[in-house]
Amino acid sequence: IATHTLPCRCKLCGKAFSRPWLLNGHIRTHTGEKPFSCQHCSRAFA
């Protein structure tokens, strides 16, 4: 039983999230964006 609301919905796949920042992180799975990089090896991460 869900006890909280999920007001933030992905326009691409319909998955719902409780917080906007969780949705923003999820959208990276669709765009392939990797905004964080390692200072030692320069490898990028989402």
From Swiss-Prot:
Its main location: nucleus. It comes from the Eukaryota. It holds the Pfam family zf-C2H2. One of its GO terms (cellular component) is nucleus. GO terms for molecular function: DNA-binding transcription factor activity, RNA polymerase II-specific; RNA polymerase II cis-regulatory region sequence-specific DNA binding; zinc ion binding. It is found in: Nucleus. SUPFAM superfamilies: beta-beta-alpha zinc fingers. Belongs to the snail C2H2-type zinc-finger protein family. This is Escargot/snail protein homolog.
